[in-house]
């Protein structure tokens, strides 16, 4: 498995989120404009898949590390409790993950993360969990199980956990909380497609539409079964 790492270098090094600017380290030039930045993120992740396929014998590609510094902008969020910038930065990364359809593991979860010392590694503070926030009882959702979690809305998103076929498109509109999945079903697979639908994005519930199949909600997940002979299945989930 090619477990390459990728980071938004400008944000990682400067510890500031600029949604309108990035630095393309391969081309060694700046990327300007919000749309251009997001296109660059997705292209960089697709390049990892292309490299694995064309230069490494077609082995699977896994984005083994990516993430953002939570102590950005002078660690203001630690005193204000406002992680909206971190949410925005994470969402931009996850939008690129969805667009490129690459498998990923975020960096990182550190059980002992503290505001004053970060992850205790290389001066980094990239953990999605903070012990100080946990000890203070801080929960972004009000649920005790979410105590200590940071910028949850940036990375706790709907996604296809298991797909009975080939994903053609997956995206999540963070502002409107609309999730779209389009896939080509493999009718030899008896199991349904399973989509994770997190309550943090749909606190008042959700509605769904399936074209080319039917759905069923169980335990906060949407299970989709393709219709007999369907060539494509389109799923849309929206907030109630």
Question: Predicted regions span which residues?
Answer:
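Conserved, mostly hydrophobic/aromatic
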Residues: 2, 65
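Aromatic-rich peripheral "rim/lid" segments of glycoside hydrolase catalytic domains that contact
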Residues: 3, 7-14, 18-31, 35-44, ...
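A short, acidic, amphipathic alpha-helical segment used as a generic capping/interface helix at domain edges
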Residues: 44-50
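Extracellular low-complexity, Gly/Ser/Thr-rich intrinsically disordered linkers
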Residues: 57, 66-69, 96
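Short, well-ordered coil/turn segments that N-cap beta-strands
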Residues: 57-60, 100-102
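Low-complexity "stalk/linker" and mucin-like segments enriched in Ser/Thr/Pro/Ala/Gly
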Residues: 212-219
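Surface-exposed interaction regions enriched in Ser/Thr/Asp/Glu
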Residues: 223-240
């Amino acid at each position: 498995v090619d477990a390459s790492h990728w980071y938004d270098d400008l944000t990682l090094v400067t510890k500031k989120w600029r949604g309108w600017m990035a630095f393309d380290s391969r081309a060694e030039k700046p990327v300007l404009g919000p749309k251009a930045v997001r296109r660059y993120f997705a292209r960089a992740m697709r390049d990892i898949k292309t490299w694995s396929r064309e230069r490494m014998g077609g082995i699977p590609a896994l984005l083994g590390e990516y993430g953002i510094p939570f102590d950005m902008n002078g660690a203001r969020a630690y005193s204000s409790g406002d992680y909206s910038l971190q949410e925005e930065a994470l969402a931009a990364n996850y939008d690129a993950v969805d667009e490129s359809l690459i498998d990923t593991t975020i960096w990182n979860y550190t059980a002992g993360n503290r505001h004053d010392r970060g992850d205790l590694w290389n001066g980094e503070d990239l953990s999605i969990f903070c012990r100080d926030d946990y000890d203070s009882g801080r929960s972004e959702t009000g649920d005790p199980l979410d105590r200590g979690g940071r910028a949850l809305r940036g990375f706790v998103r709907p996604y296809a956990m298991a797909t009975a076929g080939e994903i053609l498109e997956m995206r999540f509109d963070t502002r409107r909380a609309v999730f779209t999945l389009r896939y080509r079903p493999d009718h030899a697979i008896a199991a349904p497609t399973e989509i994770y639908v997190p309550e943090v994005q749909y606190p008042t519930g959700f509605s769904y539409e399936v074209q080319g199949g039917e759905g069923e909600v169980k335990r906060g997940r949407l299970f989709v079964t393709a219709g007999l002979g369907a060539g494509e299945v389109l799923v849309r989930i929206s907030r109630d």
